[in-house]
């Protein structure tokens, strides 16, 4: 009986990686993905290569904000720098910055810098009109050029060693002549220090022609004398500035403090200004002289996030969304029934606003669990739509960046991409890892995000938007990013330096890097006998490379190392071994491009 010939099965399998992916911390890994990376880039995809070099732009003492508008803007402590020059003072701390026309606006300081006029100033303004100095007509408000006022010192003072039997006249009233500054004291009664009480008015060891003291306390001392605590008042000549120095026609100002003419309190729009006279709409005031101290204010809301869209500054405060008057970041309360008016709307969703940004023809206001989308071109046309979607994580308001009409941001569960519909989670490869306090920027192609991990360590990741690859560059803690003239800048929160990305290695020198490939188990049961494994890499002159292997969860052991002063292509053999699974870790310093990884194996028994 003739039987057919059977071909002997060698059981050999061959697999190769010629396309390397990014990091993948999840269970769903694929050939070419990395369990960990450091100092790597996808710039030479499909190969693995090192990140570009970095160079120092400038050193700062305590920088907290970076912004680009024609030149770099930096907040260093309390200094606001534009193009390397200090142009104004702000409070220390984090900032939200946006630009409208030629004005760079800064919150929470409510300040601005005009790049054209080189003026640094305040968006808000206040103008006190002291008691008896403000005069109203039916449509005007005026103050005199000069007037003596009763000015109280801010800090209390004391006088010590006052004899218990000293006779001091205590008055019940004091007034200042507005024209001459002369003091008139009324209701005088002689008292001794033990009898003085809070609120008594005295003139003790002061210039009685223009000063008096309001008693705060009178206390017996150990030597039998008394110490009198007081607040000093002085008749001071006050010169009122022209209203043009603080206000402009069209400003909405809040008038408060009117007691004699209480009807005049409220918000009104200035129609014209002439020196120390403001003109408003007809017949809105009660005419007369106001006895109270009047405060005139151009108010600006305390916005916690801001952006610019369609020539308005948008922002959020509490549950309210605000928009400035058209082209005017100083006015948020102008309601004149015009298309140029300010705008405000309260929303009823839970939680605080966590960020806002202009996107396409809309403005997006984010919370952690929703987004409010505002459509329209002017206040009467504005409509707000609310969508329950994953929003921006609290503390990650600076993670917003737009690349090719896609908005990227950090949410609670990871990094999302938004294109107008439902946001898409693009960080599934992070698995169960969670990150916080993200700050991000872009070079126009890649999304750079610096964030804190579960144990508080900072990590800088880069997402290649063209290839959907995540790589960890290093442990940089970036306080802010800015993109200017083709270069991405960031503030290093640890060193206080402003750094430039995408540079050569002239300043940094050869950089260290590490790539740990995800575990190889060939997705089959049984121990595998590897007959051949090798890597192919191109190395620049002076670079070095080390290869290590870990089998069945054991420690890494070195299997190859090379260093050469000349550029070369190397083929790295890895000694065959029988195991269920293994990992490969590559590390080095200098330019080294990993091109492929080939392995041949046969599957044996499970033991």
Question: What residue spans do the PLM features occupy?
Answer:
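Blade-loop segments of beta-propeller domains
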Residues: 62-63, 77, 82-101
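Small/polar beta-strand repeat architecture
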Residues: 123-180, 186-198, 203-302
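Beta-propeller and closely related beta-pinwheel folds
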Residues: 56, 297-441
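Short beta-strand elements that form the blades of beta-propeller/WD-repeat-like
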Residues: 70-76, 103-107, 312-317, 354-356, ...
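Beta-sheet repeat architectures centered on beta-propellers
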Residues: 1-70, 391-395, 402-406, 413, ...
